[in-house]
Amino acid sequence: MTTVNYETDVVAWANEQAWLVRNKKFELLDIEHIAEEIEDVGKSEQRELASRMAVLIAHLLKWQFQPEYRGASWERTIKEQRKSLEFHIKQVPSLKSKLSNSEWQGAVWADAVTIAIKETAIENFPETCPWTVENILSHNWLPTSA
């Protein structure tokens, strides 16, 4: 039994759980909440990957469909997202499998299109992503004008 309530102060609870583990007081651990927190770490990593990929794809859409507005800001965002995605996948190699998952790709594409529509007022983007994951992540590739 823990002395700090998970529901009222998760930071104090986490510190207490860490202390219990380090002091081998396993019988006092809040196993159910620890398991939830461990699962949430993985979900958080997946959300970050999807979010960064959606922002990258949205900017690639803007680059392709609004060539007259291309500028250093868009190019910088594209480069930053690619670099961040590359770093993130190196830090969490198991995330790489998401990149080839068609269901995940579809969800990311839908998010990217939503972002692009909000930022451009263009509503006739392709139904599915016209680019390969390799192109999207390539530091040397940008889509050509539509």
Give the location of each predicted region.
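Surface/interface-facing alpha-helical segments and adjacent flexible terminal/loop regions used
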Residues: 1-146
